[in-house]
Regions:
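Alpha-helical interaction segments
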Residues: 2, 354, 411-414
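Bacterial N-terminal signal peptides
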Residues: 2-15
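Hydrophobic alpha-helical context, especially transmembrane and signal-peptide helices
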Residues: 4-6, 75, 458, 487
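Generic marker of residues within folded, mature protein domains
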Residues: 11, 91, 118, 173, ...
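Beta-strand-centric surfaces of beta-sandwich/beta-rich domains
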Residues: 22-390
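Extracytoplasmic
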Residues: 376-549
Length: 549
């Protein structure tokens, strides 16, 4: 893998000069040739004369020399970016080529240096401007630009983008500019960006070839996707080559979302000359998607198969296979897949249905001259996925309403959740149970979901709703503390009070105990067409509990 990585990293900049005959020649061969230009770096390092305002913020002087004395303050190499502020990482004159960007910052969880938490990377909007153009050539949330979607941190090990250990953000896309380059991050969160470190490496050039293309990356979203139209990833006029995409999907229906094909229109054609065979096929997987990371494609985050509210993020880099266009390109993908019988007018499950899921994407491409893509990244408030929950019951918020068997129970704060979980601690399986009440105000199609904690000393439990067994046994054992949603029931509950009961039925052989941790019980909405067709409206869920997959 290392040899492939080195070879193709050289290929990333090949569009700026000559293309190596093969990746095997690649970087190692080019190092034995004269290199033109002068290496430069823009960095967050502490500089002479800079002072802090209070304990965190610092007065910036990017022209001052780096500070390297023995005072501890010389190690304050980071910035704090307050809510609503824009931090300029780079503002340099060209011509030149950016060859590498590295950055890191604290995650959103409360911790020592940020006791109230920090912005997550979906709330940080990254913009890059070339040659004093008022419109950004790059506009995307920091996370999505680095193939980390939904505000979740995931490791990515690919050629142009590497996020080591889910918190060290690296980018090797080559980004040429003639007159100037400005890179900035706007904090669109209500919390600060804490401990922002960065290094941006670039080569100052005497000149760039006249036909050198600019690097572009643009975020776009539809929550949910527009009915009757393929989802648009990129549409621009001009000459260039499409080099990759990041796609994030949050499902609103059960079953597999990804039967839709990519359809790419080249140079103004009305019918796509590039037409794929399925969403997972475009992302170079087969028979579905699963978490993986490779040099050319990957799925950094995939939580569960076929659930309502499932999350999938995927990337595909066209490094050896750029999609070349001369007058324009339009990149789309269908939003078709399986749906459950209750969403089908004929009450059957089929593989080819237009779905109504939430899509977000980042397109990556090179183009000579300005882009005409009209997409713009909305504010972080609009990028946040809308809630699908009709009812949320957090047991830790109202412990007086709870009942449990032998053992004790306590509210507990974990880094997994913004709110506390309810931790039930029985000493054995016999007599171990807990009950949680919930209120239903109107009859509508809903899905019952438990948001549970898993750990090394947790047990196995069976769920009951008003005395009716629902779902299979749930094994809450995990060698490390983790979180998982358990989907138990699709039903049309009548208005009234219900009781969810969890009974301990034993433990995993590897578990050290019988504990049970619940963050919340949720009643999740189904798509409007479930109510429109009403197939299960008058069925008694108690006689035949159903969960659609």
């Amino acid at each position: 893998l290392a040899g492939v990585v080195l070879g193709v990293i050289a290929l990333l900049g090949a569009g700026l000069g000559t293309v190596p005959e093969s990746p095997a020649q690649g970087l190692m061969e080019s190092l034995a040739r004269p290199q033109e230009g002068r290496s430069m770096r823009v960095t967050s390092t502490m500089r002479q004369g800079e002072i802090r305002r209070g304990a965190a913020q610092r007065m910036r002087d990017p022209q001052a020399a780096p500070r390297g004395d023995l005072d501890e303050a010389s190690n304050w190499d980071n910035f704090r970016v307050e809510p609503g502020e824009t931090h300029i990482l780079m503002d340099e004159k060209g011509p030149g080529v950016i060859t590498h960007i590295w950055m890191t910052f604290l995650g959103p969880q409360p911790q020592r240096w940020a006791p109230k938490g920090s912005a997550n990377h979906q709330e940080m909007l990254l913009r890059m401007y070339w040659d004093d153009n008022p419109r950004p050539a790059v506009e995307a949330p920091v996370g999505d630009f680095f193939a980390n979607c939904f505000g979740k941190r995931s490791e990515v090990i690919s050629l142009p983008v590497i996020v080591e250990d889910a918190d060290s953000y690296n980018c090797y896309w080559h980004m040429p500019f003639r007159k100037s380059a400005r890179i900035e991050i706007e904090n669109q969160s209500e919390k600060p960006i804490s401990l922002l470190y960065y290094n941006i490496d670039w080569i100052k050039k005497e000149r760039l070839p006249d036909d050198t293309p600019y690097f572009y990356a643009q975020y776009r979203q539809e929550y949910p996707v527009e009915k009757g139209k393929d989802y648009l990833i990129l549409e621009t006029q001009g000459k260039g080559h499409f080099v990759g995409a990041v796609l994030a999907v949050r499902t609103r229906s059960p079953a597999w979302f990804g039967e839709g094909d990519e359809k790419i229109y080249i140079d103004g054609e009305t019918k796509p000359s590039i037409w794929g065979t399925g969403t997972e096929d475009y992302f170079l997987s087969a028979w579905g998607l699963k978490t993986t990371s490779t040099p050319y494609f990957g799925v950094p985050y995939f939580d569960q198969w076929g659930i309502v509210g499932g999350h999938t993020s995927a990337y595909r880099w066209h490094l050896n296979d750029p999609i070349v266009f001369n007058t324009g390109i339009k990149v789309t993908i269908e939003h078709f897949g399986w749906i459950s019988p209750d969403e089908n007018p004929e009450y059957k499950s089929t593989s080819w249905n237009e779905r109504e899921d939430d899509y977000a994407s980042v397109a990556f491409w090179y183009q000579t001259g300005p882009s005409t893509f009209s997409a713009r990244a909305p504010h972080a408030r609009q990028r946040r996925l809308p809630s699908l929950e009709r009812v949320i019951v957090r047991p830790a918020d109202n412990p007086a309403s709870l009942r449990h068997g032998q053992g004790s129970a306590v509210a507990q704060q974990l880094d997994l959740y913004e709110d506390k979980q309810w931790l039930y601690r029985p000493s054995q399986a016999d007599g171990a149970w807990l009950e949680i009440p919930l209120e239903v105000k109107r009859k509508e199609p809903l899905r019952l979901v438990l948001n549970m904690t898993k750990s090394y000393d947790f047990g196995r439990y069976q769920a009951f709703l008003n005395g009716v067994k629902i779902g299979p046994e749930m094994d809450f054992y995990s060698p490390k503390i983790a979180n998982e949603e358990y989907h138990l029931l699709d039903f049309w509950p009548e208005p009234g009070t219900y009781t969810l009961r969890l009974e301990c039925v034993g433990k995993n052989p590897q578990s050290h105990g019988y504990y049970c941790g619940i963050e919340s019980l949720r009643l999740r909405e189904r798509r409007p067409r479930v109510a429109q067709y009403g197939h299960d409206k008058d069925k008694d869920w108690r006689k035949n509990p159903i969960l659609y997959h």
